[in-house]
Structures are given as C-alpha cells and as structure tokens.
C-alpha cells in the first residue's frame, strides 16, 4: 500500500488531514505560485494543486501525494493575505454584506503509476453587514493577518457571517476532506479501513 504525503507545510492542512486518522508525512513542494495572466481562480488552484503534488514525485516514488491550493475571491478579484491590520480592515469592509467565494484545488497523485485525480471545491461565505467597530474589534482580537480574506472561520471569524454554503466545511480551512476520501478510496486506501 503506498504511503501518503501531504505536499504542504500548512499547520491547518496538517490538522485537517489528521482527522482521517491515517499515517502521513508532510513535505514542502517547490512550485512557483505566480498566477498566469489568463487563469481564472478555478484554473489557478487546480494547476497549483496538481503541480504541488507532482513536484514531490521524484523524492517520493511509490507514494500517494496530496496537493492543495486555495484562493479567496471577492467581486471577481483574488484576495490575498492582508499582512497588515489596515489591509485586514480594508478586506473586511469590502466583504461586509457580500459573498466571498473560496476555491480550493485538490490533487491526489500516485507517483507509482502516474495516476492523477483532481477536483476544485467552491465554498461561499456570506458576510453580514459589519460596523467599523465590529471590524476593528475582530482584527484586534483575532489578528487574521496571514489568512486570505482576513478571517479564521474555525475561530472568532464565525461571528462575521450570515451563512456558509458548500459541500464540505473543511474546504474553507484549506483541504476538502470529503473529496479527498473519495480519491483515496479510488486508490484503494480507505481511511475507515486503516
């Protein structure tokens, strides 16, 4: 049975994959994440997830390698990590009363036989109307400076939303586990069977 590799150093993706109670290792993929000028958000995350998984194939032959990438889209524009409190407040002002869509690309690459499975999972976050005071307090309390969209849905960010829409809530954190389980089963690795 091939061993499992997560092509990521993200502690959030690691924590999500640990939910499946299967052994795996993490490795940093070497991929240029610069978007191509003609790529849609869906195309970007699909390409990057695939490249991340395949970039580790030579280091990990005979493995199942998981690649994942995510973008946050508001008003048709990709929204990155804010990195500063002012940028976080600006992103949250734009999101207030709007829908932010996350696209998460997922790839499972079998480096033993070259079989590749891919999927893009969308997830919509409906923001309620936020006051300036609410935005300021949220940024001060949560410090979401390294989170695309300037919030942590798994934390205090839940207070910002009217509703969430998507097939798998794990998608919002960065790894669609329902789709991944389906891919793993197709490779003969059922998480429920050890």
Curated annotation (Swiss-Prot):
The record marks 12, 70, 154 as: Important for substrate specificity. The active site is at residue 69. InterPro entries: ITPase-like_fam, Maf-like. CDD domains: Maf. GO terms for biological process: nucleotide metabolic process. Its cofactor is a divalent metal cation. SUPFAM superfamilies: ITPase-like. One of its GO terms (molecular function) is nucleoside triphosphate diphosphatase activity. Pfam families: Maf. Keywords: Cytoplasm, Hydrolase, Nucleotide metabolism. It catalyses: N(7)-methyl-GTP + H2O = N(7)-methyl-GMP + diphosphate + H(+). It is found in: Cytoplasm. Its EC number is 3.6.1.-. It is an enzyme of class 3 (hydrolase). The keyword Cytoplasm applies. GO terms for cellular component: cytoplasm. Belongs to the Maf family. YceF subfamily. Nucleoside triphosphate pyrophosphatase that hydrolyzes 7-methyl-GTP (m(7)GTP). May have a dual role in cell division arrest and in preventing the incorporation of modified nucleotides into cellular nucleic acids. This is 7-methyl-GTP pyrophosphatase. It comes from Escherichia coli O157:H7. The gene is yceF.
């Amino acid at each position: 049975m091939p061993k499992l590799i997560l092509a990521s150093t993200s502690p959030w993706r690691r924590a999500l994959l640990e939910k499946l109670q299967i052994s795996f290792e993490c490795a940093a993929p070497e991929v240029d994440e610069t978007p191509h000028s003609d790529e849609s958000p869906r195309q970007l995350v699909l390409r990057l997830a695939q490249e991340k998984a395949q970039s580790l194939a030579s280091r990990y032959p005979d493995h199942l390698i998981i690649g994942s990438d995510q973008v946050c889209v508001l008003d048709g524009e990709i929204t990155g990590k804010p990195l500063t409190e002012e940028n976080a407040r600006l992103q949250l002002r734009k999101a207030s009363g709007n829908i932010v869509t996350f696209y998460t690309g997922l790839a499972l690459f079998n480096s033993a036989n070259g079989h590749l499975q891919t999927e893009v999972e969308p997830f919509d976050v409906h923001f309620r109307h936020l006051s300036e005071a609410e935005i300021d307090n949220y940024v001060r309390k949560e410090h979401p400076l390294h989170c695309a969209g300037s919030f942590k849905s798994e934390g205090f960010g839940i207070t910002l939303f009217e509703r969430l829409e998507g097939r798998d809530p794990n998608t919002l954190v960065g790894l669609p586990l329902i789709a991944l389980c389906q891919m793993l089963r197709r490779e003969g690795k059922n998480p429920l069977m050890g």
